[in-house]
């Protein structure tokens, strides 16, 4: 589906319990079966983090498919409380605007 943007609004832990699996490497590269995920860049802001990944399908040779690599941007909102909704809406609205304007017409849907 040519997805290039992932929006994450939960943290990995909630009240000390695992809420979401970390599907990206802390640094460097990790292999998940035939998909290689390389963390390229991390930008930390007050209410969110932007991570850039390079995904590579190692099952496909470069000669067989020129589409075996893809750049993914992950927008991770870090201020969602463990219970309820955010107290202040403006940081969340800014996050939604920033994460949605980066999508290009060639991109697939934004995955939330």
Curated annotation (Swiss-Prot):
The keyword Methyltransferase does not apply. This is Tyrosine-protein phosphatase 7. Residues 1-112 form the Tyrosine-protein phosphatase domain. Its EC number is 3.1.3.48. It catalyses: O-phospho-L-tyrosyl-[protein] + H2O = L-tyrosyl-[protein] + phosphate. The lineage of its organism: Eukaryota, Metazoa, Chordata, Tunicata, Ascidiacea. Coiled coil: none annotated. The gene is STY-7. Substrate binds at residue 82. Transmembrane segments: none annotated. Gene3D superfamilies: Protein tyrosine phosphatase superfamily (3.90.190.10).
């Amino acid at each position: 589906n040519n997805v290039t943007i992932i929006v994450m609004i939960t943290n990995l832990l909630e009240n000390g319990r695992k809420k979401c699996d970390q599907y990206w490497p802390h640094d460097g590269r990790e292999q998940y079966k035939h998909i290689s995920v390389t963390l390229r860049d991390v930008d930390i802001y007050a209410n969110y983090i932007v991570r850039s990944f390079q995904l590579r399908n190692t099952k496909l040779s470069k000669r067989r498919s020129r589409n075996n690599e893809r750049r993914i941007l992950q927008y991770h909102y870090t201020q969602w409380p463990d219970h309820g909704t955010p107290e202040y809406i403006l940081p969340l609205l800014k996050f939604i605007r920033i994460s949605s304007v980066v999508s290009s017409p060639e991109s697939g849907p934004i995955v939330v």
